[in-house]
Amino acid sequence: MLVAVDGVDGAGKTTLADELAPMLGAAGKPVIRATVDAFHYPRARRYRLGRSSPEGFYRDSYDYAALKATLLEPLGMGGSRRYRRAIFDVDADRPVDGIEEVAAAGSILLFDGIFLHRPELRDYWDFSIFLDVPCEKNHHLSRQPSWNVGLPDPSSPDHRYAEGQRLYFRECNPKRAASIVIDNVDLAAPAIVERL
């Protein structure tokens, strides 16, 4: 089973996935944790449209073909169960020789990241969660001054991220595509607000 935890930067995706993993494990389900952040493109590709380009952030951040080939397809229905959790170290800006692992039968992939309801990914998910946190309430970026006043200053690095997220919302409508939408403004009290 492939489960996606999607939401804007700083919405609490990794936190929620990390909290769900041991619960599923305690219920006797083998869990594989992975993140889209291990599938970045190299820096040259990510910034080919410019360091402040929202379009570049949305279109060129992640290597979805590699994600599908090395993780989603092997773990999907009829897949080989031989997978890799990572292909790229974004901090070192270099590929990693990720260890090929073999999933136990019945494993659940709990995968977190941004942009997970893009057309090229959405059909892979057996279940998906979208964490609904407005940009101004974003747990990470709300501390950045430019995020607190609506649209970030176009010269701010935050402009790339905020407008890239808005592009994703316009093109993919992740709230509509998700199996459930969780209001995660209050990390201590998440609330399901929509279900398919």
Predicted ranges, named:
Residues K13:
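Conserved lysine of the Walker
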Residues L16:
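Hydrophobic positions on the alpha1 helix immediately C-terminal to the Walker A/P-loop
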